[in-house]
């Protein structure tokens, strides 16, 4: 982190924010840096669906991302699986990250839906506590996802209203 602070001038406390798994989604301006914090879906060590923070920092010379773990949202960019992304078009790049994030939520929601249906079928047959507990875990995940998606929506709306970030005509297709 010290190298990133030295190279970009981003405050160390701002860089550490997404390393706190309780950090909330928001957008802030700190000097010349626009900070976008959003929640992304993830699986925890017990294979439960949770959300974790992703920090995106836009400075004049760079875009920096910070997350508690390696994420498929960013991996797609690193592996050149996203067409027409350019880091010099910073706002568009952020919109593409947010779009990928929304796609990840949809993928996880489809998985949760399938698992819920399977558990419900088992529950009709067995009527055991194990299936009820599994169903409750999935319900909890849905609450996390719903809360995070609402927060992410607020961040996106604020980002669209922010005049400090340059927007491109082709951004409309992502939105």
Question: What label would you give each PLM region?
Answer:
Residues 1-174:
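Peripheral, non-transmembrane regulatory/ligand-interaction domains of membrane transport proteins
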């Amino acid at each position: 982190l010290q190298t990133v602070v030295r190279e970009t001038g981003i405050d160390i406390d701002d860089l550490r924010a997404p390393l706190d798994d309780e950090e909330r989604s928001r957008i802030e301006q700190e000097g010349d840096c626009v900070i976008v914090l959003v929640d992304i879906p993830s699986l925890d060590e017990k294979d439960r669906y949770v959300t974790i923070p992703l920090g995106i920092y836009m400075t004049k010379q760079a875009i920096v991302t910070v997350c508690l773990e390696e994420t498929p949202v960013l991996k797609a960019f690193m592996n050149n699986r996203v067409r027409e992304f350019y880091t010099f078009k910073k706002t568009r790049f952020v919109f593409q990250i947010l779009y990928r994030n929304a796609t990840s939520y949809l993928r996880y929601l489809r998985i949760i839906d399938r698992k819920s249906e399977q558990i419900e079928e088992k529950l009709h047959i067995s009527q055991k506590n194990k299936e009820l507990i599994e169903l409750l875990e999935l319900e909890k995940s849905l609450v996390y996802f719903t809360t995070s998606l609402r927060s992410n929506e607020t961040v996106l709306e604020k980002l669209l209203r922010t005049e400090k970030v340059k927007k491109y005509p082709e951004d409309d297709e992502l939105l």
